[in-house]
Design a protein with these regions (language model features):
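Cross-family detector of peptidyl-prolyl cis-trans isomerase
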Residues: 2-166
Length: 166
């Protein structure tokens, strides 16, 4: 049991960026398939005028109020209802299951698409959003009813916006 200076361990194998490259390719392929599916839904829906948002999803207004109406800003409290459906229209969570929500804009965690969608709605408006999976619950799902990489349709109604007093 003598003193021995520590020896550096050598790596067993050299890792390349292949995992990340493969992951990126899978994501690009998934995104392309989802976009094609969403575009097909829009083409088949002649009743609604879809808007392509700057956030990377599509939506249309079920109920629209004056175009000069106030849109929520950072810290505003938004009282709203929504439901979640699969891309084929099957209800995953009903409005009654989710219940009325209060959300402090950009101060609390909700899924990305919903947070960005709420920024587009004024008090009294209702819109239907089609979110690709990366704007919904992404790879992990919601660990309950929503699985991995599932695009969603959400109908969102803003009941009230309380302006941030700060």
């Amino acid at each position: 049991m003598g003193c021995k200076s520590p020896e550096a361990r050598k790596p067993i194998s050299v890792k390349t960026g292949s995992f990340i490259e493969n992951s990126a390719e899978r994501n690009i392929s998934l995104n392309k398939k989802e976009n094609e599916l969403i575009e097909q839904i829009i083409l088949n829906d002649s009743l609604n005028d879809y808007i392509s948002s700057n956030y990377g999803f599509y939506y249309y207004f079920n109920t629209k109020v004056d175009s000069t109406s106030y849109l929520p800003q950072f810290g505003d409290i938004i009282n709203f209802n929504y439901n979640i459906k699969s891309i084929n229209g099957e209800t995953i969570y009903s409005k009654d299951e989710i219940k009325t929500q209060n959300y402090a804009m950009d101060k609390e965690e909700i899924f990305t698409g919903l947070r960005e969608g709420l920024k587009l709605l004024s008090e009294g408006e209702t819109a239907t959003f089609i979110f690709p999976s990366q704007k919904a619950f992404g790879y992990y799902g919601d660990e309950n009813k929503i699985g991995t990489n599932i695009p969603l349709i959400c109908k969102v109604s803003v009941n009230k916006i309380t302006k941030n007093q700060q």
